[in-house]
A protein has these predicted regions:
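Glycine/tyrosine- and acidic-biased, solvent-exposed loop/turn segments at the edges of beta-strands
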Residues: 4-158
């Protein structure tokens, strides 16, 4: 881990001002840890990070050193674990979370990494529980999808 950090910092420090270049960082065993674009010592554009076993860990875009836009996160066996939007390095908008077979188990609205809006829990394709959050605090919970959609004036959220 220490070697990884040293290599990563040295790669970022070698970036000439204003010039964009492609960077690769490796684990101590020689496996790739991450790769992507660097400009003005900050991550920009598309990046891929890898687990120590070589499987993709996460991938997405950076802007001015912050995670931006849509990202995918994977388990160390390559299964999709979660996906959603970042804004200035914080999770925002809808995020989806998956089980090991690739089924959605949870969707949640986030604002600056905090639950803010609706969170839906699934079993198969059915919503089994819904909650509404405000600034990370649960405000209400429903276990009946029909009642939930009616009380909140919502259409199909599946």
């Amino acid at each position: 881990v220490q070697l990884f950090i040293i290599l990563f910092l040295s790669v970022l420090c070698l970036t000439p001002n204003g010039e964009k270049h492609y960077s690769k960082v490796y684990y101590a065993d020689g496996n790739i840890a991450c790769e992507g674009w660097v400009q003005d010592s900050k991550k920009v554009d598309f990046w891929i990070f890898y687990h120590a076993n070589g499987q993709v860990k996460n991938k997405g875009h950076y802007a001015l050193g912050y995670r931006e836009k849509y990202w995918h996160h994977y388990t160390n066996n390559g299964s999709l674990e979660s996906e959603g939007h970042y804004l200035k390095g914080k999770k925002n908008n809808w995020w989806s979370y998956y089980n090991s077979t690739g089924e959605v188990i949870h969707k949640c609205q986030l604002h600056n990494d905090v639950k803010n809006g609706y969170c839906l829990h699934f079993k198969g394709n059915e919503i089994v529980k819904a909650s509404r959050y405000s600034e990370g605090k649960k405000q209400q919970e429903w276990t009946d999808y029909t009642v939930f959609t009616r009380e909140n004036n919502l259409l199909n959220l599946r």
